[in-house]
Curated annotation (Swiss-Prot):
Origin species: Xanthomonas euvesicatoria pv. vesicatoria (strain 85-10)
Primary enzyme class: hydrolase
Keyword Transcription: no
Localization (cell): Cytoplasm
Complex and partners: Homodimer.
Protein name (database record): D-aminoacyl-tRNA deacylase
Entry's family note: Belongs to the DTD family.
Catalytic activity: glycyl-tRNA(Ala) + H2O = tRNA(Ala) + glycine + H(+); a D-aminoacyl-tRNA + H2O = a tRNA + a D-alpha-amino acid + H(+)
Motif Gly-cisPro motif, important for rejection of L-amino acids boundaries: 138-139
GO biological process: D-amino acid catabolic process
Xref: NCBIfam families: D-aminoacyl-tRNA deacylase
InterPro entries per record: Daa-tRNA_deacyls_DTD (IPR003732), DTD-like_sf (IPR023509)
Domains as described in the record: A Gly-cisPro motif from one monomer fits into the active site of the other monomer to allow specific chiral rejection of L-amino acids.
Entry EC number(s): 3.1.1.96
């Protein structure tokens, strides 16, 4: 499992012209599920999403986490994130978990984050064509693995 996280001033995800999730200041996390991702890896990624220090402290140093700031978290499933791009001119998706494996893993990640984060956790709709609107703050973007 991997997450491309972006510090945002706001973000929203829309499906069929309806906003299904939106946050103010916080993190947008695009989530790729890989075959065999374990419960332990999912829990570890949730922990990292909530505790990774990418927000400035009083001195402007990246020293505060989402938990510290109480910011929002918007989780969006994105199987293309787990694509094999090592050769050729077209991505391969054998390195991404199939939907029957990926959807429960993504939903588990959402549930864990909602249980542990009081700042609000929103999510896109798994498997849907989504439009993601965001304002990246910084820009600050990191690729996280459990």
């Amino acid at each position: 499992m991997l997450a491309l996280i972006q510090r945002v001033t706001r973000a929203a995800v829309t499906v069929d012209d309806q906003i299904v999730g939106q946050i103010g200041p916080g993190l947008l996390a695009l989530i790729g599920v890989e075959p065999g991702d374990s419960d332990a890896q999912i829990r570890r990624l949730a922990e990292r999403l909530l505790s990774y220090r990418v927000f400035g402290d009083d001195a402007g140093k990246m020293n505060r986490s989402l938990t510290d700031t109480g910011g929002g978290l918007l989780l969006v499933s994105q199987f293309t994130l787990a694509a094999d791009t090592s050769s050729g001119n077209r991505p391969g998706f054998s390195t991404a978990a199939p939907p029957l494996e990926a959807e429960p893993a993504f939903n588990q990640l959402v549930a864990i984050c909602r249980e542990k984060h009081r700042g609000g956790v929103e999510a896109g709709r798994f498997g849907a064509h989504m439009v993601v609107d965001l304002v990246n703050d910084g820009p600050v973007t990191f690729l996280l693995r459990p």
